[in-house]
């Protein structure tokens, strides 16, 4: 988070000491699809920077063939005081990745990957057209041939990246295959790792592997990016007390 040159001076009159604390600038981050949206340049951002010491940053993500892990795996999100995401495609499951701590490993396309998934942990895949072959105690495929990916069982079959739970029923592991890169993720714990608000152009999804959805930061039927911008500013500055309607 950027530290401004402006310093707050706090005087402790009782003992005559003087403490100087740095004034930290808040940052509101907006993430929107790469198709034309809201113009964040110019006087609009200057208003809040000059008047309220708030930095407004805008970023875009690839709307087609969107990889949510790749979108969120950017250092910018860690410096945001609050992150607002505009989602035109409701199939993009941002909730799953923002509402819990997940550890994801990326695997290359068009290769067979042997992966062990302990049964006492919870795993899910972010993939499209992913298949797998579970192994028995002799490391032989269970009703599938590890050498022939055409005999594998389908985990995900979609033209977009989807979140799918993986049944952890064998200790010996699985062989995975996909023609596209994919992720195997372990859910480590429940809880937001960033203060965020989701704005869906249409109806909001429930979240594929989330145990529960925090409807307090999910908004639906937000037709324009501009509506998101003014709503998140309203939330940030606390001018009104209006509950989201998901």
From Swiss-Prot:
This is Outer capsid glycoprotein VP7. One of its GO terms (cellular component) is host cell endoplasmic reticulum lumen. One of its GO terms (molecular function) is metal ion binding. Belongs to the rotavirus VP7 family. Homotrimer; disulfide-linked. 2 Ca(2+) ions bound at each subunit interface in the trimer hold the trimer together. Interacts with the intermediate capsid protein VP6. Interacts with the outer capsid protein VP5*. Calcium-binding protein that interacts with rotavirus cell receptors once the initial attachment by VP4 has been achieved. Rotavirus attachment and entry into the host cell probably involves multiple sequential contacts between the outer capsid proteins VP4 and VP7, and the cell receptors. Following entry into the host cell, low intracellular or intravesicular Ca(2+) concentration probably causes the calcium-stabilized VP7 trimers to dissociate from the virion. This step is probably necessary for the membrane-disrupting entry step and the release of VP4, which is locked onto the virion by VP7. Keywords: Calcium, Capsid protein, Disulfide bond, Glycoprotein, Host endoplasmic reticulum, Host-virus interaction, Metal-binding, Outer capsid protein, Signal, T=13 icosahedral capsid protein, Virion. Residues 1-16 form the signal peptide. It is found in: Virion; Host endoplasmic reticulum lumen. The keyword Disulfide bond applies. Pfam families: Rotavirus_VP7 (PF05868). HAMAP family: Rota_VP7 (MF_04130). The lineage of its organism: Viruses, Riboviria, Orthornavirae, Duplornaviricota, Resentoviricetes.
